[in-house]
């Protein structure tokens, strides 16, 4: 189930405030956020937002294709190092 239309998309209030202030001043610098659940809105296009992945902030450049998605979708929290290799010596015995 999606979010109710009368509520609108969730965006962290402080993040939205920072983006709107930067738009008024025509500034483009990095914005750090921990809010992975925030929805990307059209006012964020062209900004670089550093989203926390649990260890560090990963910079994401917002494009028009990302509108409607969540910030956390573009920053993986887990590093996949591959499946366990087959032990051929043990298989022969």
From Swiss-Prot:
It comes from Synechococcus sp. (strain JA-2-3B'a(2-13)) (Cyanobacteria bacterium Yellowstone B-Prime). InterPro entries: Ribosomal_uS19, Ribosomal_uS19_bac-type, Ribosomal_uS19_CS, Ribosomal_uS19_SF. One of its GO terms (cellular component) is cytoplasm. It holds the Pfam family Ribosomal_S19. This is Small ribosomal subunit protein uS19. Belongs to the universal ribosomal protein uS19 family. Keywords: Ribonucleoprotein, Ribosomal protein, RNA-binding, rRNA-binding. The keyword Ribonucleoprotein applies.
């Amino acid at each position: 189930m999606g979010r109710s239309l009368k509520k609108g998309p969730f965006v962290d209030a402080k993040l939205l405030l920072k983006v709107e202030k930067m738009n008024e001043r025509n500034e483009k610098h990095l914005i750090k956020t921990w809010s992975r659940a925030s929805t990307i809105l059209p006012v964020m296009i062209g900004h670089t937002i550093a989203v926390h992945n649990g260890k560090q902030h990963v910079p994401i450049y917002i494009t028009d294709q990302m509108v409607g998605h969540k910030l956390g979708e573009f920053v993986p929290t887990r590093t996949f190092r591959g499946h366990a290799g087959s032990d051929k010596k043990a298989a022969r015995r």
